[in-house]
Regions:
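Short capping/connector residues at structural and topological boundaries
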Residues: 84, 125-126, 134, 140, ...
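Mobile, glycine-enriched helix-loop/loop "lid" segments at the mouths of ligand-binding/catalytic clefts
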Residues: 175-176, 180-206
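Glycine-rich, flexible loop/turn motifs
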Residues: 37, 79, 125, 131, ...
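Short regulatory "switch" loops immediately downstream of catalytic or recognition motifs
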Residues: 55-60, 173-176, 236-246
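N-terminal Rossmann-like NAD(P)+-binding domain of SDR-like oxidoreductases, especially those catalyzing
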Residues: 1-174
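Short-chain dehydrogenase/reductase
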Residues: 90, 138-146, 180-188, 192, ...
Length: 326
């Protein structure tokens, strides 16, 4: 089977491409390379351009009319940057995605898997969020993801599309075969900063916030190996129709599924696990929370297990080891 992956030259998109290939499928990549890496497209079908370039999208589908479903990963994803540069985030993540979704439905390619985020959840007392948990996106980045979920849901209702929004928790690690991994020069995510600190590119690792209402005062997250995350996308794409059947075939043609491990790890616990894998302590200190930070959450993973027939299997230590190796 053949699938379109927007943002397929990025960290998560490229890992999804590898997982598809390993399962015997063919990814077609559409990526602007503004943040993606051209080497992640090597030996793959690749279209260099923008998701809002209607002529390019039309040409892509005319040359690959057998595309079964689309995974929409293309987006800007840095929370603090979204606070300081909201225009770019709403332009890229919302305006262009609306155009892209409309082009998909106009061309008759109506199966969409959308890369959403757990960042749009409100904090709940026990930190475990189901897909029905209250929504409270507090950063422009999180709001763009929520807006696009609503757009996709409305398009499914109005135009007969079918959409699956996968709400990611905190991806870590790299492709276990080292075909791709995190590639930003200055990482903003916690594990990238730990690696940079361990390898001397960063002087000290800052634990942002130690007065959150968690068991040790540091933020709580659900760290999921990016390879597990990619496998969930393969399930969503290849078994697209069956996923809807398992979900009871909702009339609006739209599903939301959390992708996480189902267990919470605090930032301090992650640091301790990192030091154990790395074999020595790193320089660290507590610092105030960043703009847009929240105490955090972890996934209720029941729906993913029931509808996707998927669960996370790789331990946090492997995610750390793969990140260090990468």
């Amino acid at each position: 089977m053949k699938f379109l992956i927007t943002g397929g030259a990025g960290y998560i998109g490229s890992t999804i491409c590898s997982a598809l290939e390993d399962a015997g499928h063919t990814p077609v990549i559409l990526d602007s390379l503004i943040t993606g890496r051209v080497e992640f497209t090597r030996n793959r079908i690749f279209y260099h351009g923008d998701i809002a370039d209607t002529a390019l999208v039309e040409r892509l589908f005319s040359e690959h009319p057998d595309i079964y479903a689309t995974v929409h990963c293309a987006a800007l994803i840095v929370v603090p940057e979204s606070v300081s540069s909201p225009y770019e985030y709403y332009q890229d993540n919302v305006s262009k995605s609306v155009e892209f979704f409309y082009t998909l439905q106009r061309l008759g390619y109506k199966r969409v898997v959308f890369s959403s985020s757990a960042a749009l959840y409100d904090v709940v007392p026990d930190f475990m969020v189901t897909e029905e948990a209250p929504i409270k996106p507090i950063s422009p980045y999180a709001r763009t993801k929520f807006m696009m979920e609503m757009v996709l849901k409305d398009f499914c209702s109005a135009y007969g599309m079918k959409g699956i929004a996968l709400r990611y928790f905190n991806p870590i690690g790299a492709d276990p075969q080292m075909r791709s991994g995190i590639h930003v020069p200055v990482p903003t995510h916690v594990l990238g900063k730990l690696v940079d600190t361990a390898q001397g590119r960063q002087a000290v690792f800052e634990i942002t916030g130690n007065e959150w209402p968690t068991r040790d005062g540091t933020g709580i997250r659900d760290y999921i190996h990016v390879w597990d995350l990619a496998q969930a996308h393969v399930k969503a794409m290849v078994d697209f129709g069956q996923v809807f059947e398992r979900a009871g075939s909702p009339a609006d043609g739209y599903l939301v599924i959390n992708l996480g491990t189902g267990s919470g790890v605090t930032v301090l616990e992650l640091v301790q696990a990192f030091e154990k894998v790395y074999g020595q302590e790193i320089n660290k200190r507590f610092a105030p929370p960043r703009p847009g930070d929240v105490a955090g959450s972890f996934a209720s993973a029941d729906r993913a297990r029931e509808w996707l027939h998927w669960k996370a299997e790789l331990p946090i230590e492997l995610g750390i080891a793969d990140a260090l190796k990468w």
